[in-house]
Amino acid sequence: MKQKSIEMLVQGASSLGITLEMFHVEHFQKFYSLLLEWNQKMNLTAITEEEEVVIKHFLDSLSVIKSGKIKGGEKVIDIGTGAGFPGIPLKIVFPEIGLTLLEASKKKVNFLNFLSQVLLFEGIEVIHGRAEELGKVERFREKFDIATARAVAPLNILLEYAVPFVRVGGHFIAMKGRDIEEVYQCKNALEELKCEIEDVIEVRLPFSDILHHLIVVKKVDVLPSKYPRREKAIRTKPL
């Protein structure tokens, strides 16, 4: 990475309340290098220009810190992580979190496993599978302090994918864009899935005019066993 990109990463992280040391920067540099290398073999990301990756992938991922829920030591699952966003940047900054990356694409899982080995991560597990299936598995169901998702699906659909993994009292952090009208259209999903919206946090990404929101959802009771439903039901008959 060029010096300008490194400075943007460090300054941008600082504006989010994060101090990056040199070893953090080195990890991000390795991440970027491997992202470009593997992206030539598979579709990991359409964003490859250095400064864009810093802003739209690295700093966007780190913006989850603004939720105030990740302080280190939490069990975190990143659902539909893709190329590792936001999970890997969070793990770089908070190596003590226990991180599970859930991804349905086997090729992306292979990339994430290789990346984790290169970065010498401990306390990380990469799972090849689908959220609506693993959310019913005892080893994963209601076992995490925090679930994250950067997917583009509507919030009421994301809730059914994510909430089954979250323990009672834990949180789901949905990374959404500028428009958050859907927050006011998911009352039924919140009631059915035994959760409530605790906070909506506006985040303006450093060095850009991009406005995002973090939707912080708290799990308040044990989830009924019928959830999550099968994918077709989730998609065609959303709560």
From Swiss-Prot:
InterPro entries: rRNA_ssu_MeTfrase_G, SAM-dependent_MTases_sf. Belongs to the methyltransferase superfamily. RNA methyltransferase RsmG family. NCBIfam families: rsmG_gidB (TIGR00138). Keywords: Cytoplasm, Methyltransferase, rRNA processing, S-adenosyl-L-methionine, Transferase. The keyword S-adenosyl-L-methionine applies. This is Ribosomal RNA small subunit methyltransferase G. It comes from Caldanaerobacter subterraneus subsp. tengcongensis (strain DSM 15242 / JCM 11007 / NBRC 100824 / MB4). GO terms for cellular component: cytosol. Specifically methylates the N7 position of a guanine in 16S rRNA. The keyword ATP-binding does not apply. The gene is rsmG. GO terms for molecular function: rRNA (guanine-N7-)-methyltransferase activity. It is an enzyme of class 2 (transferase). It is found in: Cytoplasm. Its EC number is 2.1.1.-. S-adenosyl-L-methionine binds at G80, F85, E103, A104, S105, A131, E132, R150.
